[in-house]
């Protein structure tokens, strides 16, 4: 019987990418297949996030639930990876003795060896070292399902924002060699991938050697240009970027590379220069707005999303009002917004914070309601327009329909004959938007005369 692995992912797209790699590594080493049911698994892995306290505590809550599975199946292996593992290390085993494996984001490629050591010794294995970017040299070729894929181009972050734990859990910035990234993207294109999302904690800080050992360095703009030249790749996205790393070279790429989508996720974190300075973000609101102004001069239809922290220590009503003014001015399409969560070991955790929780919550609700109004307005503005979408697969709402994604990252559900589904999935097609919902759109196929009969048979 084929053994199975269950992976639960917390946090960002980097973690989603790493979770896929965990499955690939275990499939190559032991033939394990992925399952969505922990009860069916021989190995259960939690890929964790420590950006906010709530996500960290959720991990231990979930560990408590799978403890019963281990009691019923003693050979079941339980592992904790990701940023909580990197931060907590062996203390995870002390708190949850039934955990067998603890590994950091940089050591997931060592899972097969850790599993062997656990089985031979009977003792929990902990490896949370930072072996630079070694893991990419030991990962098997990606196995993908669907026309979209993530590609990690770098690890870590060297910005050391005062509130952020990432540099401590993932290390400083290290970029993959250019040829290594291009080889992975070309392999994905050969498997039918049409859209890639380039990933990094600070992705536009990419500075990769042209090839391993080479002294010649490629910047992020160069990487995008090369990826755009790979046959089969029709769309390029990236996340997460930093305003301080938005170079003129990167701005120029938006004018030269149409495959780079009209959508940008550029975290601002706050609208007050005073708070940005306390956060150690390294830019002012005016500098941030200057980047967006230049981008929108090149791409007038640019859709913009961001991250915003509410209730950072010392935030006043005036500071929050500046954030709201920026939200209105930028017309953000989406915002990942949260109440500030102090993380142990970060400088901001030592700042005095006398703002009542109720006031922070009120500010957050006001911010999120405003963003939702923006989302609704932008969705309504798309009614009647023809949008180019990449068809990703059956709709989650109705498997008899198909779903795709627009350049500005909107999901569009549309009817199509079942017989046409295999032909349409993975294709770039035109749809006319005829309904707007809070978090999705509905459309209908727009076909040239010669395509009409093929799509309906």
From Swiss-Prot:
GO function terms (MF aspect): 4 iron, 4 sulfur cluster binding; metal ion binding; N6-isopentenyladenosine methylthiotransferase activity
Domain TRAM: 380-447
GO CC terms in record: cytosol
EC numbers: 2.8.4.3
InterPro entries: Elp3/MiaA/NifB-like_rSAM (IPR006638), Methylthiotransferase (IPR005839), Methylthiotransferase_CS (IPR020612), Methylthiotransferase_N (IPR013848), Methylthiotransferase_N_sf (IPR038135), MiaB_methiolase (IPR006463), rSAM (IPR007197), rSAM_horseshoe (IPR023404)
Entry keyword set: 4Fe-4S, Cytoplasm, Iron, Iron-sulfur, Metal-binding, S-adenosyl-L-methionine, Transferase, tRNA processing
Required cofactor(s): [4Fe-4S] cluster
Entry binding sites for [4Fe-4S] cluster 2: 157, 161, 164
NCBIfam families: miaB-methiolase, MiaB/RimO family radical SAM methylthiotransferase
Residue intervals of the Radical SAM core domain: 143-377
Reactions listed under catalytic activity: N(6)-dimethylallyladenosine(37) in tRNA + (sulfur carrier)-SH + AH2 + 2 S-adenosyl-L-methionine = 2-methylsulfanyl-N(6)-dimethylallyladenosine(37) in tRNA + (sulfur carrier)-H + 5'-deoxyadenosine + L-methionine + A + S-adenosyl-L-homocysteine + 2 H(+)
Designated gene of the protein: miaB
Residues where [4Fe-4S] cluster 1 binds: 12, 49, 83
Family: Belongs to the methylthiotransferase family. MiaB subfamily.
Assembly description: Monomer.
Protein's name according to its UniProt entry: tRNA-2-methylthio-N(6)-dimethylallyladenosine synthase
Subcellular location: Cytoplasm
Species this protein is from: Burkholderia pseudomallei (strain 1710b)
Pfam families: Radical_SAM, TRAM, UPF0004
Protein role: Catalyzes the methylthiolation of N6-(dimethylallyl)adenosine (i(6)A), leading to the formation of 2-methylthio-N6-(dimethylallyl)adenosine (ms(2)i(6)A) at position 37 in tRNAs that read codons beginning with uridine.
Superkingdom of origin: Bacteria
Annotated cofactor note: Binds 2 [4Fe-4S] clusters. One cluster is coordinated with 3 cysteines and an exchangeable S-adenosyl-L-methionine.
Residues in MTTase N-terminal domain copies: 3-120
Gene3D superfamilies for the chain: Methylthiotransferase, N-terminal domain, tm_1862 like domain
């Amino acid at each position: 019987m084929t053994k199975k692995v269950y992976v639960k992912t917390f946090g960002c797209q980097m973690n989603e990418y790493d979770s896929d790699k965990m499955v690939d590594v275990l499939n190559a080493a032991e033939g394990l297949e992925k399952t969505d049911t922990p009860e069916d698994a021989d190995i259960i892995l939690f890929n964790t996030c420590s950006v906010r306290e709530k996500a960290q505590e959720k991990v231990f809550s979930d560990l408590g639930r799978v403890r019963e599975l281990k009691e019923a199946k003693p050979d079941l292996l339980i592992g904790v990876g990701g940023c909580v593992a990197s931060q907590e290390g062996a203390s995870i085993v002390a708190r949850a003795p039934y955990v067998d494996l603890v590994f950091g984001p940089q050591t997931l490629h060592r899972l097969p060896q850790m599993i062997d050591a656990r089985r031979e010794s009977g003792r929990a294995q902990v490896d949370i070292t930072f072996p630079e970017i070694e893991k990419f040299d030991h990962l098997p070729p990606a196995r993908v399902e669907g026309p979209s894929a993530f590609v990690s181009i770098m690890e870590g972050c060297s910005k050391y924002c005062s509130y952020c734990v990432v540099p401590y859990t993932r290390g400083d910035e290290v970029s993959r060699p250019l040829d290594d990234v291009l080889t992975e993207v070309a392999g994905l294109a050969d498997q039918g991938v049409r859209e890639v999302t380039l990933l990094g904690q600070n992705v536009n800080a990419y500075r990769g050697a042209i090839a391993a050992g080479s002294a010649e360095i490629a910047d992020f703009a160069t990487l995008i240009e090369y990826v755009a030249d790979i046959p089969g790749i029709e769309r390029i996205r990236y996340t997460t970027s930093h305003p301080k790393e938005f170079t003129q070279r990167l701005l120029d790429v938006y004018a030269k590379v149409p495959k780079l989508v009209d959508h940008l996720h550029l975290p601002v974190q706050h609208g007050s220069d005073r708070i940005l300075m306390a956060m150690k973000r390294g830019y002012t609101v005016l500098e941030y707005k200057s980047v967006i102004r230049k981008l929108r001069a090149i791409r007038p239809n640019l859709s913009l999303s961001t991250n915003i922290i509410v209730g950072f220590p010392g935030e006043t009503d005036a500071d929050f009002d500046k954030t709201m003014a920026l939200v209105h001015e930028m017309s953000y399409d989406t915002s990942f917004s949260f109440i500030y969560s102090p993380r142990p070991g970060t400088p901001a955790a030592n700042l005095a914070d006398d703002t009542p929780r109720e006031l922070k919550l009120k500010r957050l609700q006001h911010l999120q309601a405003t963003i939702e109004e923006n989302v609704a307005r932008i969705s309504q503005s798309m009614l009647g327009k023809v949008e180019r979408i990449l068809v990703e697969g059956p709709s989650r709402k109705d498997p008899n329909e198909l779903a795709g994604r627009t350049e500005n990252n909107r999901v569009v559900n549309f009817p199509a004959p079942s017989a046409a589904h295999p032909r349409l999935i993975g294709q770039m097609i035109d749809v006319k938007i005829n309904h707007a919902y809070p978090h999705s759109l509905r459309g209908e196929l727009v076909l040239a005369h010669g395509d009409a009969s093929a799509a309906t048979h």
